[in-house]
Design a protein with these regions (language model features):
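Soluble "head" domains of membrane/secretory-pathway proteins
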Residues: 1-171
Length: 171
């Protein structure tokens, strides 16, 4: 099933998202080989940069947030942002962005077919699609990189419970 707006997904970051990624694999070639073998049979995590973000827009949709917008906009309509962390972690510079944008102004970006635009719920502290707009995918993530949908949070313990996935584009 393809990710929908509002879904919280786990995905493998594209090259631009991986500049700070450091492999957890051992530098010892024997241990590294064992880790790879265990990963192949799902007994160890894969050696990739898996990230968690909320889907905001899907292929063919236009996403943006400009001065005066009441929220992040998809196809010219504001999305529901009730799930966004408030108060924000960091202040927003009003000369370059807004609270409703969760940081700097951006877009418009047309999401390529087969890709998704993702944003963190902690908008002012999230290096999400907005911070990768100069890469070959314009900050979007190929749906093929999605590993699954987040259903439950175990940690931190003060957030343990199910994950809401509201239709953030509902009018």
């Amino acid at each position: 099933k393809s990710p929908r707006p509002g879904d919280v997904v786990v995905f493998k970051g594209t090259e631009d998202w991986n500049t700070a990624y450091r492999s957890p694999r051992s530098e010892n070639p024997v241990i590294h080989g064992i880790q790879d073998a265990l990963s192949f049979v799902s007994l160890a995590p894969p050696d990739e940069n898996n990230l968690v973000k909320r889907v905001v827009a899907t292929g063919g949709q236009v996403v943006s947030c400009q001065a005066g917008d009441p929220a992040v906009m998809v196809d010219g309509k504001p999305i529901n942002q009730d799930y966004v962390m408030n108060p924000p972690t960091y202040p927003v510079d009003p000369s370059t962005g807004s609270q409703s944008c969760g940081g700097a102004y951006f877009g418009p970006i047309t999401v390529p077919e087969g890709n998704i635009w993702v944003m963190g719920d902690n908008r002012t502290a999230s290096a999400d699609s907005r911070y990768h707009m100069q890469d070959e995918y314009q900050g979007t993530i190929p749906v093929a990189n999605v590993r699954g949908k987040v259903m439950f949070v175990f940690y931190p313990f003060n957030r343990i419970g199910g994950v809401d996935d509201p239709d953030i584009q509902a009018s």
